[in-house]
Amino acid sequence: MDITFDHVSFTYQAGTPFAGDGIKDVSGVIRDGSYTAIIGHTGSGKSTILQHLNALLKPTSGTVTIGDKVITNETNNKNLKPLRQKVGMVFQFAENQLFEQTVAKDIAFGPQNFGVSEKDALALADKMVKMVGLPHDVLEKSPFDLSGGQMRRVAIAGVLAMQPEVLVLDEPTAGLDPSGRHEMMQMFEQLHREQGQTIVLVTHQMDDVADYADTVWVMAEGKLIKTGTPREIFADPAWLKANQLGLPKTAQLAQQLAAKGFHFDPQPLTESELADQLVPQIGGGQRG
């Protein structure tokens, strides 16, 4: 299911003295099966884009086409429930959305809200806890007795239980330690790789962009200023700096090594790419 923005603008509090632009004249396509990262400094419009992906916000002008559903400023909210099942949203600190007495009930709540029987919803809960790497015995526990990282996994399992076609992630690893962050990003990558899950990731972590995304949207001052692969986006460090963005840590390390005589072509963006180019130079004495 593609999501297409066609000259989309959104103004907060339109028609009032407090009106402010959220996004301006954005056009682009998030392809079915892609892993798209949306980056940009704070206030660039990332969150506004995100909220258009399942019509939490509707364009002030332009259209957002989600699958076969065209969203305009005039779209009636009553017709959006099926759409919101297709696009699952995982917000920052998703664990704050938990509220049920048990993990099983919390995960089953979403599917039941969309018409799935209690029996089938609980079966989905059983399946989803395994998918997010939690043991079966958490199902009967209170979500509030779990660790913060486990609570976040439960919240994500609740979104996945609705079996969305598109999974939208807003800084999903915020507040996690490096190990927890890596485990969670690997979980999303597995969903993408093994099930063809379309993923949209809003992040400040350039390492995650390099490691996982196949497409990148760069936002600045409400405008979509650049799209491309991670390699295309990270090819110009000066341009990144001008737009208050940086290189992945691996690329920064490669620059430091290049200053000491090592050669890299193309610029490595991930740890595996760096190792592939660095090991032969260390072993074979190919430094300049």
From Swiss-Prot:
<comment type="similarity">
    <text>Belongs to the ABC transporter superfamily. Energy-coupling factor EcfA family.</text>
</comment>
<comment type="function">
    <text>ATP-binding (A) component of a common energy-coupling factor (ECF) ABC-transporter complex. Unlike classic ABC transporters this ECF transporter provides the energy necessary to transport a number of different substrates including 5-formyltetrahydrofolate and thiamine. Expression of the complex plus FolT or ThiT in Lactococcus lactis subsp. cremoris (strain NZ9000) allows 5-formyltetrahydrofolate or thiamine uptake respectively; 5-formyltetrahydrofolate or thiamine are not taken up in the absence of FolT/ThiT or the EcfA1A2T complex. Deenergized L.lactis subsp.</text>
</comment>
<keyword id="KW-1278">Translocase</keyword>
<dbReference type="InterPro" id="IPR015856">
    <property type="entry name" value="ABC_transpr_CbiO/EcfA_su"/>
</dbReference>
<dbReference type="GO" id="GO:0016887">
    <property type="term" value="F:ATP hydrolysis activity"/>
</dbReference>
<dbReference type="InterPro" id="IPR003439">
    <property type="entry name" value="ABC_transporter-like_ATP-bd"/>
</dbReference>
<keyword id="KW-0547">Nucleotide-binding</keyword>
<keyword id="KW-0067">ATP-binding</keyword>
<dbReference type="GO" id="GO:0042626">
    <property type="term" value="F:ATPase-coupled transmembrane transporter activity"/>
</dbReference>
<feature type="domain" description="ABC transporter">
    <location>
        <begin position="3"/>
        <end position="246"/>
    </location>
</feature>
<comment type="subunit">
    <text>Forms a stable energy-coupling factor (ECF) transporter complex probably composed of 2 membrane-embedded substrate-binding proteins (S component), 2 ATP-binding proteins (A component) and 2 transmembrane proteins (T component). This complex interacts with a number of substrate-specific components, including FolT and ThiT for 5-formyltetrahydrofolate and thiamine respectively.</text>
</comment>
<keyword id="KW-1003">Cell membrane</keyword>
<dbReference type="InterPro" id="IPR027417">
    <property type="entry name" value="P-loop_NTPase"/>
</dbReference>
<dbReference type="GO" id="GO:0043190">
    <property type="term" value="C:ATP-binding cassette (ABC) transporter complex"/>
</dbReference>
<dbReference type="InterPro" id="IPR003593">
    <property type="entry name" value="AAA+_ATPase"/>
</dbReference>
<dbReference type="InterPro" id="IPR030946">
    <property type="entry name" value="EcfA2"/>
</dbReference>
<dbReference type="InterPro" id="IPR050095">
    <property type="entry name" value="ECF_ABC_transporter_ATP-bd"/>
</dbReference>
<dbReference type="InterPro" id="IPR017871">
    <property type="entry name" value="ABC_transporter-like_CS"/>
</dbReference>
<feature type="binding site">
    <location>
        <begin position="40"/>
        <end position="47"/>
    </location>
    <ligand>
        <name>ATP</name>
    </ligand>
</feature>
<keyword id="KW-0472">Membrane</keyword>
<dbReference type="Pfam" id="PF00005">
    <property type="entry name" value="ABC_tran"/>
</dbReference>
<keyword id="KW-0813">Transport</keyword>
<dbReference type="GO" id="GO:0005524">
    <property type="term" value="F:ATP binding"/>
</dbReference>
<protein>
    <recommendedName>
        <fullName>Energy-coupling factor transporter ATP-binding protein EcfA2</fullName>
        <ecNumber>7.-.-.-</ecNumber>
    </recommendedName>
</protein>
<feature type="active site" description="Proton acceptor">
    <location>
        <position position="171"/>
    </location>
</feature>
